[in-house]
Amino acid sequence: MIEIRHQTVLGAGTVRSAYDAFYRQRKLLMRDSFYLWLLELAQPQAGELLVDVACGNGRLVELAARRGINALGFDLSFEGIQAAAAETQGASWVVGNGQTIPFPDACADIVLSIGSLEHYDQPTQGARELARILRPRGRAVILLPNAFGLLGNMRYVLRHGEVFDDDQPQQRYATRRTWEAMLRRGGLAVEGVVPFNEFNAPRTPRDTVWTVTRPQKFVKAAIGRVTPLNWANHFVFLCGRAAQPDPAHYPMLAYP
């Protein structure tokens, strides 16, 4: 596992203050088609509760609420949640720490964690909390970055001699099997893995225009289709709640 820590979390500041400062300066957003694709993977049904843990600016929650889904966004940063709530109707918002989620056990039908556990102080504890709030037959959709993504870190290292740093306070990269071991240790059962290689087929008119004006995206999409799973840029883990955590030692996983 590769770890990056910025001075904002090594000095006197906290991760929360670092993220508040981060969101005051910029937004963390992907194309809408990315979030719609994740919702397709989650398959929310009428009456179910969807919780996006570490939702950031809350765009996925906003898109879910527009489609009549009972959606709740949860994030460490007050600044991020405040911005999300100002732009969204029909959703609920809570500020808190993903390592100690203030929700009762087995309360959520769907839990999403999209590019967030790798930024936690204790990622395994974050996985435990996702498993705890998930209902016994619930579904978790968890996106995590690959240390050896062909179009991601491997390409970036070839050019720069170092892994990509997205400027968040702290970041980690790992292989598929290391992330799977962490999720199992947290009490999640990995039922499937879907690759994400920085491209989604457009699902909105705006994203269609954006895509067709960037022909290089089609090249990336073609490469992504033939890229082996273990070289994907990111992994989307489709999980259920395990009967019990798997405490087995995994030498590549340094976190308890």
Question: Where are the language model's segments positioned?
Answer:
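Conserved N-terminal segment of class I S-adenosyl-L-methionine
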Residues: 1-100, 112, 127, 232-235, ...
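A short hydrophobic/small-residue beta-strand
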Residues: 71, 140-141
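Short N-terminal helix/helix-N-cap motif within the alpha/beta-hydrolase-1
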Residues: 79, 120-125, 152
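A short SAM/SAH-binding and catalytic strip from SAM-dependent methyltransferases
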Residues: 110-121
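A short glycine-rich, Lys/Arg-flanked "PGG" loop and its adjoining helix->strand segment in the class I
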Residues: 124-139
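Conserved class I S-adenosyl-L-methionine
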Residues: 141-163
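A C-terminal cap/extension of S-adenosyl-L-methionine-dependent methyltransferases
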Residues: 155-161, 181, 192-256
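Acceptor-substrate binding/catalytic loop of class I
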Residues: 160-178
